[in-house]
Amino acid sequence: MMKIRASHILVDTKEQAENLLLDLKNGVAFEDLAKQYSKCPSGRDGGDLRWFGKGMMVKPFEDAAFALKEGEVSEPVETQFGWHLIKLTGIDE
């Protein structure tokens, strides 16, 4: 089964996520933004969620993460937890 490794930043609003996406486009490191702004405990690790397969994350998050190319960052994704920016950091087929 294919697994991916991803990092994410979890915030309360779409506006916050969009502002962080602008910071990323302006060259701020994803890991630094995760440490500073993410509400998820993974923020301490730069947002790293380690390796996971399909069925291990909530559906909107999983769909967005598995659609990314390695190194790519998603548009803001809404789940019941809030708004995520997801960065795909590895693919293990």
How should these model regions be labeled?
Residues 1-26, 41-57, 86-93:
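Well-structured core secondary-structure elements of compact alpha/beta domains
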Residues 26-31, 71:
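Glycine-centered tight-turn and secondary-structure capping sites
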Residues 56-70:
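Cell-wall glycan
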Residues 73-79:
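Short acidic-hydrophobic surface loop/beta-edge motif
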